[in-house]
From Swiss-Prot:
Entry-linked InterPro entries: SprT-like_domain, SprT_Zn_ribbon, Uncharacterised_SprT
Protein residues bound to Zn(2+): H69, H73
Entry protein name: Protein SprT
Cofactor: Zn(2+)
Domain SprT-like: 10-157
GO CC terms, sorted: cytoplasm
Native source organism of the sequence: Pseudomonas paraeruginosa (strain DSM 24068 / PA7) (Pseudomonas aeruginosa (strain PA7))
Family: Belongs to the SprT family.
MF terms in GO: zinc ion binding
Amino acid sequence: MPEHLNARVEACYRQAEDFFQRTFPRPTVSFRLRGQKAGVAHLDENLLRFNPQLYRENREHFLEQTVAHEVAHLIAHQLFGPRIRPHGEEWQLIMRGIYGLPPDRCHTYAVKRRTATRYLYRCHCPEHNDFPFSAQRHNLVAKGRRYYCRRCKATLVFSGEVTRD
């Protein structure tokens, strides 16, 4: 999987070097990105992070557009410095002039939401007694943290029920 993406990063750098007649330091490329973002350029670290799930699901467009988008951020930063806007004029010129691509700010990939597990906690209030806790909050309770109902001031207790959104 990474060999095609790394080859595209290299191709984008060569295009920029041919255009600007100078060399650019190559970034570290990582596939450690999750969630909604397809890619992120860390300017000061010269690091590109890509979302492997979105890459697998949208491979052709991802290689063409997303990789160039993130490389353009690093090139713009190295050419024009840290004071430029992330999707400003300089970045747009690189996207259009070097890569011949539309300077789209955001992707339109379908992002699958992961299912959230909720742990139901209860108090003694008759009308206000269900409190769905996240896994993180549930684990904090297991480590001794206490949560209280704002109405009756009783400690919330795990009911044993688990739901999935």
